[in-house]
């Protein structure tokens, strides 16, 4: 360093004036961190030695500020070089502070270090290029922030509490016996306490564990009080403050302290807990019903059950505890029943909850609360009060005393009936009966519908309200105004005028339309200038068919006339006619039909009117087919019923066959006879034989002549015939009038045991006819010459002989 000083021509001492040129700037200071180099700092120009930190003497030196051309101090950076050259800078860079050197005594930003001597090392510090231009201000934290910086943890008291907390937690979790004191050092045991199962609760181990738990809770509470940032364990429960307030039941046995504290449905107790934040419960003898003790067997033993009746107040803070205790203490002081406002409020609240409160009743005359109707001050006044009825809208009486409150439903029924009347519908029979029953006065007609009465007359509708029941005035109708119902939906007023203008002068014609949609409602009104015109229009247009609708025309306002139930329709002639009695054999007899109304009852022995189903064609005249004698040809598809014992029965309706679909259908109207020649030429021969045409299309329901007591009229005699009757259905056993047998009966059924009478000789042409079928009307025949009973007995004897 001395060589550097000697070789530097620009170095000057402090006693010399500073140079004016730029080349007189002081060189950079040497590394002041090394104390060995402090004595060689001669470039400051100080000749007075000063003691070094190591004890060596050094010259006192002053730092000369670096001045620029304008006189402002200049700071050189690492790259800045002045006229002194780079030797000093190279020397200063070689000597850097080690990381193990002690820290400097002053900051590089200390202004005193720049202006004079360095108190720590006596050297000037070089400013780094990364140093801040302005020094940072030191922040002084308040005292309460020290708790959050972690410095509070080093408090001896907190450390002692933490160590004790860890020790207690270790003892509780180890499972080792907590009370291991010898026999002589133990304290006397308290009185044993047993649970509901007879097991002792307060054992030595249990008491030791409870003692450690209480101590642990207290330590945690103290740590939280000293260090609010302390996080307690998860199982920590803050201890609650509690206070017992005994109820003076012995001093005041008849006073209801519990009711005043709990209140109606517990509302008073809940209100005090909500206002104070404390918990208020009643404990002791008598606080729990006797039946509840059996339900609490599994619960923890509560030593307060054997204490006197008291109120237990629990709170987390002392303020909440004192507030709740003050409220309860006021209720524990007995007060006279007359002056007990608290009890009166509880009773009012209970009545409100039960819905039986009566303090808010209003007077029915004036509507004001506070007095009854009999004590109303405006009882004798005649003015109308401000009360408005919600039913009739009238003042002077409340809604509950409305005289027409019971007629709301009847009014709706009347409106509905008016609506039906406008639509042209009929009135239900029940409404007519009801109006007849509720007739008012002796002169009122019970047949009028409800809308025909004067419903707006309040006196007649309610004669029991002080009014004299009088006959309601009859409603006057405008005979010239007509109601027209069931109009087409597209009919307008002009169309209505054109429809009814032919009956006279029309004063007004209107089709009623919907106000919202603008469409026709289906009815309207026409007003004529004269009553005669209106009556003519009613007679002509009522029931008139117009565009697929039947118009209903009547006087407006009047109910439609009652419609009588329609009678049974007159019987119409069937599609196939019945020939008269003088037509050829095989046809049906003629029937007489009434043109209208009710028909007369049929003759008891005659058959009922057959159904209107198609019947079989009439048989061809005799001689068309000649069956071979001796050949058995039963009817096609015919089924015979089993023979009934000794009783003549009619065939069931389902035993007949329909005619073949290939047969042509032919109908004869009543009164028209079938021509045998025409029938012969029009009917083709049948391939199934002559018996096929003998079956009707659908059997009608038959009558049983044996059920009637009347005797049928006598029949005219019939000539004998030599025609073969083996294929004739007239010989069937269920025939009512069988024909007389002929000599050839080889293929007939007349000898069947169930035949009641021997057959009679039919007329010519009955061999293939249906005239002898029992459900067909029989032509008049003469009674047989021989006795039918003797013939029946002979046939029965033949049958019995064959059976043997």
Curated annotation (Swiss-Prot):
Q: What's the main place this protein lives? A: nucleus
GO CC annotations on file: nuclear speck; nucleolus; nucleoplasm; nucleus; spliceosomal complex
Q: Where is this motif: Nuclear localization signal?
A: 123-127
Record's Pfam families? KH-I_KHDC4-BBP, RRM_1, SF1-HH
Which part of the chain is the KH domain?
256-328
Which residue ranges have biased composition labelled Low complexity? 446-464, 625-639, 657-670
Q: Which UniProt keywords apply?
A: Abscisic acid signaling pathway, Metal-binding, mRNA processing, mRNA splicing, Nucleus, Phosphoprotein, Repeat, RNA-binding, Spliceosome, Zinc, Zinc-finger
Please state the residue ranges covered by CCHC-type zinc fingers.
363-378, 389-403
Q: Ranges for the RRM domain?
A: 480-558
Provide the tissue specificity: Expressed in the shoot apex, flowers, stems, leaves, roots and seedling.
Asked if Cell membrane is a keyword of the record, the answer is no
Q: Where is this region: Disordered?
A: 1-139, 175-195, 437-476, 556-595, 623-695, 709-804
Q: What happens when the gene is disrupted?
A: Pleiotropic developmental defects, including early flowering and hypersensitivity to abscisic acid (ABA). Enhanced accumulation of many mRNAs, including heat shock mRNAs, with altered alternative splicing pattern.
**Xref: InterPro entries:** BBP-like, KH_1_KHDC4/BBP-like, KH_dom, KH_dom_type_1_sf, Nucleotide-bd_a/b_plait_sf, RBD_domain_sf, RRM_dom, SF1-HH
Q: Where is the composition biased (Basic and acidic residues)?
A: 795-804
So what does this one do? Necessary for the splicing of pre-mRNA. Required during development and for abscisic acid (ABA) responses.
Q: How does it assemble?
A: Component of the spliceosome. Interacts with U2AF65a and U2AF65b in the nucleus. Binds to DRT111/RSN2/SFPS.
The protein here is known as Splicing factor-like protein 1
Q: What is the scientific name of the source organism? A: Arabidopsis thaliana
Q: What is the lineage of its organism?
A: Eukaryota, Viridiplantae, Streptophyta, Embryophyta, Tracheophyta
Q: Which gene encodes it?
A: SF1
